[in-house]
Amino acid sequence: MMFRLTSVSCFLLVIVCLNLFQVVLTRRCFPPGTFCSRYLPCCSGRCCSGWCTRRCFPRFGKRATFQE
């Protein structure tokens, strides 16, 4: 009887620990200079073009030129 009670309590303890780890890992954030996305947020600053930065700067691409 004691073995059964101990194994059940250990099993429940493992379930509780796994739930706590899931909450901690899903609520983590990333420092500036690391990859980010909508589901992986930055700790401070913003997610600009997939990278955590303090400020977002506009990026200008190459303009198309007409050739005659």
UniProtKB/Swiss-Prot annotation:
The cysteine framework is XI (C-C-CC-CC-C-C). InterPro entries: Conotoxin-I_CS, Conotoxin_I2. This is Conotoxin Eb11.7. GO terms for molecular function: toxin activity. The modification Phenylalanine amide is found at F60. Expressed by the venom duct. Residues 64-68 form a propeptide. Keywords: Amidation, Cleavage on pair of basic residues, Disulfide bond, Secreted, Signal, Toxin.
